[in-house]
């Protein structure tokens, strides 16, 4: 007998599946009754029965129904994941739900979409920039059309757009002034043309010097080069004339480059020779271009007043602020110019008589027959140096040098004040002039020459060159040869006919009282950083040289600091120089080259130490030996009696109150 299952029992094959699905039921409801209640509840809610609620099918439909959208997403993902794990754990299916679940760089569609999006974004940015540029172009074209009355062809038109009509603004028509266009400096225009022509000429010269050219081409290039050179010379000439015709610069602003350098033919004699005149009375000076605040100095001793600081006046500026004016004496090759420069205050010596020798004008004795006049110094000589030696000066021309002119300063050291710069070292200038410069109180001595010395690596002197530094092995040569007695000339600027001897200097301390100028060689002592107004004249102190007749007197001489010497005048200026023998010229040239060779090996490291220099001399030439000591220790001496040959026999020393006689 067959057994039928009970209604409230679950078939044995379905119980495990219901438990596996884990669907909750109300307690007490089992079997078909529970299924019917669940179906009825879903139908009353208005929803269709879900496909997976059927007992016979557990597969998801290929096409979801109306109830699929209301299904919770968690349930959908759980079902999809459950099936994928059953089919393959390593592969994710994209056919269950019809939605691509893959994303990121592994997806074959995503990089292309991203690239397309970036390109579209860049295109939109470029289009916006192009539109802005076109708008700016339209605005500029409209402004131009308002000025000219015509719309430019560059005006951008949109598709189907017509060109706008623009009317010119009132007052927009005008003409530019030619003067406003060409009001630039003509000098600058000429300079630019000259610079361009220099380059063109250089290019033409290089083309002419090229190799492997035919005769015709070489001739043409040479002709072109000559034409360009002519144009260059014409431009240079026009530029020089234009500069000359332009407004002249003030006298105080002369270019210093020319004053700070000396050429190879520089020598001290350019500043030594004074212009000769038939009469002793100088001509009245013409109108001076100097400012009216600088009065001209008087030309006679009677009109001169002692220069010094005024009472209650503030201290003046240092000496370096006073300008130096070029004079006609600096151009010996030119004819005397009728200008006020030689007699202006900046170039004329300021002299003042004194009653007697002061403490700063100490005269040191030496048994020689020469007088001294200080050397003319040039402001800026402590700045400029050159390396070439100077041309030697012929002795015949030196014998006719009557005096040296010292560059003047407008006030002495008391009025000008001490320089703010530290002193480097004292400087000695040894100068000798013939007796023809002085009144004929006694017959002129036969050995008269003009010698000077300075320390300059490029501007040498006429007779005495560089001394050697302490520790230097290179001696320096100094020479002095006797000459024939020069003719007596009267020169302006050296000695005035006022009954007293006037030293051509710029400071009252350099003057001597009437009748007090004993014949002999003197040493000009100067501080290099100081103006020439603070120079002092000294004579060498008596020493062991008086014990022997043949022993030359030693001099105290310190190295000058960068003295600037000007050119040597031509031999054609000196009538006596034309008859010089070739032997004399060769001798001078030989000693000049010897000095240049020795100076090239001399170390310059001791130039700033104020060291005393010792010089060795050849036979037959006068020389200067070792310094006797600081100038503060040199006593003042007076010659009481001389021998017939001019040597001092009896000397009085005021400091010690002694009379020294030579036996």
From Swiss-Prot:
The keyword Repeat does not apply. A motif (Nuclear localization signal (NLS) 3) lies at residues 422-428. Keywords: Coiled coil, Cytoplasm, Disease variant, Immunity, Innate immunity, Nucleus. InterPro entries: CCDC120/INAVA, CUPID. Residues 327-340 have a biased composition (Basic and acidic residues). Residues 118-147 form a coiled coil. A motif (Nuclear localization signal (NLS) 2) lies at residues 332-338. The keyword Cytoplasm applies. One of its GO terms (cellular component) is nucleoplasm. Residues 40-50, 259-272, 455-475 have a biased composition (Low complexity). This is Innate immunity activator protein. Highly expressed in intestinal myeloid-derived cells and expressed in monocyte-derived macrophages upon induction by PRR activation. A motif (Nuclear localization signal (NLS) 1) lies at residues 164-170. Interacts with IRAK1, NOD2 and RIPK2; the interaction takes place upon PRR stimulation. Interacts with YWHAQ/14-3-3T; the interaction increases upon PRR stimulation and is required for cellular signaling pathway activation and cytokine secretion. Interacts (via N-terminal domain) with CYTH1 and CYTH2 (via their N-terminal domains). Interacts with FBXW11 and BTRC; associates with SCF E3 ubiquitin-protein ligase complexes. Residues 1-68, 242-362, 378-425, 444-493 are annotated as: Disordered. Residues 282-298 have a biased composition (Pro residues). It is linked to Inflammatory bowel disease 29: A chronic, relapsing inflammation of the gastrointestinal tract with a complex etiology. It is subdivided into Crohn disease and ulcerative colitis phenotypes. Crohn disease may affect any part of the gastrointestinal tract from the mouth to the anus, but most frequently it involves the terminal ileum and colon. Bowel inflammation is transmural and discontinuous; it may contain granulomas or be associated with intestinal or perianal fistulas. It comes from the Eukaryota. Induction: Expression is induced by the component of peptidoglycan muramyl dipeptide. Negatively regulated by microRNA-24 (miR-24). Its main location: nucleus. Residues 350-361 have a biased composition (Polar residues). Pfam families: CUPID (PF11819). GO terms for biological process: adherens junction maintenance; innate immune response; intestinal epithelial structure maintenance; nucleotide-binding oligomerization domain containing 2 signaling pathway; pattern recognition receptor signaling pathway; positive regulation of canonical NF-kappaB signal transduction; positive regulation of cytokine production involved in immune response; positive regulation of interleukin-1 beta production.
């Amino acid at each position: 007998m067959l057994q039928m299952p009970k209604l409230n029992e679950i078939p044995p094959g379905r119980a495990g599946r219901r438990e596996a699905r884990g669907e909750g039921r109300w307690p007490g409801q089992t079997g078909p009754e529970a299924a019917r209640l669940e179906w009825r509840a879903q139908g009353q809610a208005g929803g269709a029965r879900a496909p997976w609620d059927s007992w016979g099918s557990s597969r998801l439909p290929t096409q979801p129904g109306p109830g699929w959208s209301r299904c919770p997403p968690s349930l959908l993902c759980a079902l999809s994941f459950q099936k994928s794990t059953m089919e393959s754990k390593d592969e994710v299916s994209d056919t269950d739900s019809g939605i691509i679940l893959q994303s990121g760089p592994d997806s074959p569609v995503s990089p292309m979409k991203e690239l397309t999006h970036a390109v579209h974004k860049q295109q939109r940015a470029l289009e916006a920039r192009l539109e802005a540029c076109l708008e700016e172009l339209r605005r500029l074209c409209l402004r131009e059309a308002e000025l000219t009355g015509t719309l430019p062809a560059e005006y951008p038109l949109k598709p189907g757009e017509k060109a706008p009509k623009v009317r010119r603004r009132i007052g927009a028509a005008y003409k530019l002034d030619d003067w406003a266009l060409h009001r630039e400096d003509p000098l600058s225009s000429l300079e630019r043309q000259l610079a361009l022509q220099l380059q063109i000429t250089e290019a033409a010269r290089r083309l002419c010097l090229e190799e492997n050219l035919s005769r015709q081409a070489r001739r043409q290039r040479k002709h072109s080069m000559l034409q360009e050179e002519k144009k260059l010379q014409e431009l240079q000439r026009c530029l020089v004339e234009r500069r000359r015709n332009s407004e002249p610069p003030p006298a105080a602003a002369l270019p210093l480059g020319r004053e700070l350098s000396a050429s190879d033919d520089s020598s001290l004699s350019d500043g030594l020779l004074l212009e000769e005149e038939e009469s002793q009375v100088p001509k009245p000076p013409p109108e001076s271009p100097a400012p009216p605040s600088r009065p001209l100095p008087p030309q006679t001793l009677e009109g001169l007043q002692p220069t010094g600081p005024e009472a209650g006046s503030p201290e003046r500026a240092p000496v370096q602020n006073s300008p130096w004016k070029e004079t006609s004496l600096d151009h010996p090759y030119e004819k005397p110019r009728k200008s006020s420069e030689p007699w202006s205050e900046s170039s004329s010596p300021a002299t003042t008589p004194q009653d007697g020798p002061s403490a700063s004008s100490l005269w040191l004795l030496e048994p020689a027959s020469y007088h001294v006049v200080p050397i003319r110094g040039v402001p800026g000589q402590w700045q400029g140096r050159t390396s070439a030696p100077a041309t030697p000066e012929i002795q015949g021309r030196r014998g006719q040098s009557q005096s040296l002119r010292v560059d003047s300063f407008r006030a002495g050291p008391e009025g000008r004040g001490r320089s703010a710069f530290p002193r480097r070292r004292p400087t000695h200038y040894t100068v000798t002039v013939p007796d023809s410069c002085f009144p004929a109180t006694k017959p002129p001595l036969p050995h008269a020459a003009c010698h000077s010395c300075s320390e300059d690596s490029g501007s040498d002197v006429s007779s005495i060159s560089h001394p050697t530094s302490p520790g230097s092995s290179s001696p320096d040569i100094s020479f002095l040869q006797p000459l024939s007695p020069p003719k007596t000339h009267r020169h302006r600027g050296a000695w005035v006919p006022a009954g007293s001897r006037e030293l051509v200097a710029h400071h009252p301390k350099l003057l001597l009282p009437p009748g007090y100028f004993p014949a002999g060689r003197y040493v000009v002592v100067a501080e290099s950083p100081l103006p020439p107004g603070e120079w002092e004249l000294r004579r060498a102190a008596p020493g062991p040289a008086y014990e022997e007749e043949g022993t030359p007197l030693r001099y105290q001489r310190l190295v000058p600091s960068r003295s600037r010497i000007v050119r040597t005048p031509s031999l054609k200026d000196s009538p006596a120089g034309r008859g010089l023998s070739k032997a004399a010229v060769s001798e001078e040239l030989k000693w000049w080259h010897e000095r240049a060779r020795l100076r090239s090996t001399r170390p310059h490291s001791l130039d700033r130490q104020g060291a005393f220099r010792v010089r060795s001399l050849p036979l037959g030439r006068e020389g200067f030996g070792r310094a006797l000591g600081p100038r503060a220790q040199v006593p003042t001496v007076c010659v009481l009696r001389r021998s017939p040959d001019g040597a001092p026999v009896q000397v009085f020393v005021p400091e010690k109150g002694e009379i020294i006689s030579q036996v």
